């Protein structure tokens, strides 16, 4: 029974990584093709999560996950991962430190996409930098089509 519980806990921990969807990967590639990355943004975008801080905080029982679950661009599922890491500490250090660093990077990528896709200021910064994304072009065409009626 003890091995089964340990297996379930490990399976939950290994599946707890934050991932990007295919659409988010495509949008990220499009931004990167225009020279916009998490490390080299256009305008005032700031990374909401630090991978180094999240990883270092997870040396303590689950604190890095609580940081990712409650800070800017919070993903609430990380609070649960933090509780599970707390319950399995000190063993959880083995997976929690790299998991938190990777998840912080993915959260930053997701927020970069959101900022330049939906945020008014982010859209304006792309426009000022003369960068057009394909989904913005489609929106402009739809808007022009609607105005013609």
Name each region found by the language model.
Residues 17-55, 76-149:
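Transmembrane helix recognition focused on a "late"/terminal membrane span
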Residues 66-75:
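Extended, hydrophobic alpha-helical membrane-active domains that insert into or remodel lipid bilayers
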């Amino acid at each position: 029974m003890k091995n089964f519980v340990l297996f379930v806990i490990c399976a939950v921990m290994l599946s707890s990584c934050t991932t990007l969807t295919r659409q988010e990967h495509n949008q990220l590639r499009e931004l990167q093709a225009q020279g916009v990355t998490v490390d080299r943004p256009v305008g005032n975008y700031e990374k909401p999560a630090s991978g180094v801080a999240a990883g270092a905080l997870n040396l303590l029982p689950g604190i890095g996950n609580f940081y990712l679950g409650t800070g800017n661009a919070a993903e609430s599922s990380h609070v649960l991962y933090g509780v599970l890491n707390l319950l399995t500490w000190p063993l959880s250090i083995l997976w929690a430190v790299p998991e938190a660093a990777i998840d912080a990077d993915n959260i930053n990528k997701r927020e970069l996409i959101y900022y330049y896709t939906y945020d008014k200021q982010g859209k304006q910064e792309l426009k000022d930098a003369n960068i057009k994304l394909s989904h913005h072009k489609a929106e402009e065409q739809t808007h022009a089509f609607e105005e013609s009626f």
